[in-house]
From Swiss-Prot:
Organism the protein comes from: Xanthomonas oryzae pv. oryzae (strain MAFF 311018)
Purpose of the protein: Part of the twin-arginine translocation (Tat) system that transports large folded proteins containing a characteristic twin-arginine motif in their signal peptide across membranes. Together with TatC, TatB is part of a receptor directly interacting with Tat signal peptides. TatB may form an oligomeric binding site that transiently accommodates folded Tat precursor proteins before their translocation.
Protein encoded by which gene: tatB
Transmembrane helix as UniProt keyword: yes
Protein name as annotated: Sec-independent protein translocase protein TatB
GO biological process: protein transport by the Tat complex
């Protein structure tokens, strides 16, 4: 504590032995030891108090730092809250302006006007009902006529009936005609200068044998 070395202690002991003598030296040593203990105890207590104070100061500094950070956070939160409130107020003002503009553009009907409108509507309805009752039942709307294509019936199958076979009755001279052969017909050459009229030929046997 006092930074006293071994040589210094021996020097102090020799001086005390010479001054006090051998009889008083033990008592003086005990007294000096007690004072040294007390001084050390005091020093230790002071040292501990100093350390405690230093720790308390450090804690205070740390608390101050924390408080400063908390204050900064509070300031930031307040600024944000103010910004949000300003935005909400601006939005509220815009909405109120729009509502005022719309309300001024479209006037609100009073209760008297609403009652008058209801009465007029009921009067119109009664008048229309009376007119409909006096005119009689309204004719039913004509149903739209839709021309439907009728299916074409197939034509009846026509059966061709063969005509009766005509029986040809031979004439009495038919046998003679078939049995007698016809003579050959001779054609004379016709000149260019002469007329093209045919010359009468001799009557055939068929013509002679006519009845």
């Amino acid at each position: 504590m006092f930074d006293i070395g071994v040589g210094e202690l021996t020097l102090i002991a020799v001086v005390a032995l010479v001054v006090l003598g051998p009889e008083r030296l033990p008592k003086a040593a005990r007294f000096a030891g007690l004072w040294v203990r007390r001084a050390r105890m005091q020093w230790d207590s002071v040292k501990q108090e100093l350390e405690r104070e230093l720790e308390a100061e450090e804690l205070k500094r740390s608390l101050q730092d924390v408080q400063a950070s908390l204050r900064e956070a509070e300031d930031q939160l307040r600024n944000k809250q103010q910004q949000v409130e300003q935005g909400a107020r601006a939005l509220h003002d815009d909405v109120s302006r729009d509502i005022d503009i719309r309300s001024s553009a479209t006037p609100v009907a009073t209760p008297l006007e609403l009652a008058h409108a209801d009465l007029s509507a009921s009067a119109h309805v009664d008048a229309a009902a009376g007119a409909a009752a006096g005119a009689g039942p309204a004719p039913a709307p004509a149903a739209p006529v839709i021309a439907q294509a009728q299916p074409i019936a197939p034509a009846p199958h026509q059966t061709l009936v063969p005509a009766p076979h005509d029986t040809i009755v031979p004439a009495p001279h038919a046998a003679h005609l078939t049995s007698a052969p016809a003579p050959p017909v001779t054609v004379a050459p016709v000149d260019a200068g002469t007329s093209a009229s045919p010359t009468p030929s001799e009557p055939t046997k068929i013509q002679e044998k006519q009845p």
